[in-house]
C-alpha cells in the first residue's frame, strides 16, 4: 500500500487499529470452541521487523472491523483495502508440481488457496512460528 496508494488513502488508515479474530469468517464451523477463539488488535499498516517496510495487515477471513470508527465506515474502508490487496499487480502465483513446498511470511504476504487441482488431491501442513507483535 505504501508504494501504490495515494497519500490520502495512507493517511486515512495509518493510525487505525483492527480487531482480528482467529476464526473470523470460519467461526460458524465449530460453535463449541467459540469461547476459545483468540482475539487480537493490530495496526492496519504494520512495519516488518526485519525489512522496515510497511504492509497492510488486514485479512477478509479474520479482520472483523476497524476500531473506534462507525461500523459502516469500517466496512467501507476494509472493502476498499481488500480490493486493493486483491489486485493482480500484488500477486505471486505458485504452480504446484510433485513435492512442491510453498512458504511465505505472513508479516508481509497473504495466501489464497485456489481449488484448481481437481481431480487430484493436495495436502498441506500449516506451520506457525511464534513471532513479534505487529507494530
Task: Please identify what each model-predicted range represents.
Residues 1-101, 106-135:
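Non-heme Fe(II) oxygenase catalytic core, chiefly the N-lobe of the double-stranded beta-helix
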